[in-house]
């Protein structure tokens, strides 16, 4: 079975599984004021109120139960209004990396370096971050380095062997979720995950 690129920044819309070529090096950022203020912000002294939200279920377009997702851009406008009305300072977005199964809420990731294409392109994702930052709203990402699904196009048995996961199923299988568990004893796996955390901060602010 063909594997998706573990470092791809964009993926086909499910049920497609292929990686797509895109360039995220030239994303247009307009949140310089926010970024400057964030450097001086003291989270130990400043008030902080976090609203956790799953984009796919928070709000949908009427009459479209199965799909009807708001795009990154639509969501940014809607959530900003709500956040300002309610007095929240930060939004924590659940499970935003690419994942094949809607029901996992983004917690069974196949594309660790790609914002999910359910809601738009990487450019649209950056637009959302820009919009929220310009409106004074901080963005927290729910990062999911614990386990990953067995989908054939994903990380499981990537080269035919236990590449990212433990080879011993007693360690490498998550009994509750039926997923694979990262082998953090491997330098390559630790590097993959640490680089991934840095990637989101550096590329998407």
Which stretches of residues belong to each language-model region?
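The feature marks proteins involved in alpha-glucan
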Residues: 1-52, 57-65, 74
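Substrate-binding/active-site clefts of carbohydrate-active enzymes
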Residues: 38-45, 54-205
């Amino acid at each position: 079975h063909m594997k998706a690129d573990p470092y791809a920044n964009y993926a086909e819309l499910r049920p497609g599984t292929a990686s797509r070529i895109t360039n995220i090096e030239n994303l247009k950022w307009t949140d310089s004021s926010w970024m400057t203020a964030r450097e001086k912000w003291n989270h130990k002294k400043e008030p902080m109120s976090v609203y956790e939200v799953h984009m796919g279920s928070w709000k949908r377009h009427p009459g479209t139960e199965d799909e009807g997702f708001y795009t990154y851009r639509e969501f940014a406008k809607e959530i900003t209004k709500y956040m300002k009305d309610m007095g929240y300072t930060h939004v924590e977005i659940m499970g935003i990396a690419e994942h094949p199964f809607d029901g996992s809420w983004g917690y069974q990731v196949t594309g660790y370096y790609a914002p999910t294409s359910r809601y738009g392109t990487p450019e649209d994702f950056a637009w959302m971050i820009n919009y929220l930052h310009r409106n004074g709203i901080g963005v927290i990402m729910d990062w999911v380095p614990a386990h990953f699904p067995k989908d054939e196009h994903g990380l499981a048995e990537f080269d035919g062997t236990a590449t990212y996961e433990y080879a011993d199923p007693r360690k490498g299988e998550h009994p509750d979720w039926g997923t694979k568990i990262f082998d953090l004893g491997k330098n390559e796996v630790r590097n993959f995950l640490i680089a991934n955390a840095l990637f989101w901060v550096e590329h998407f602010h």
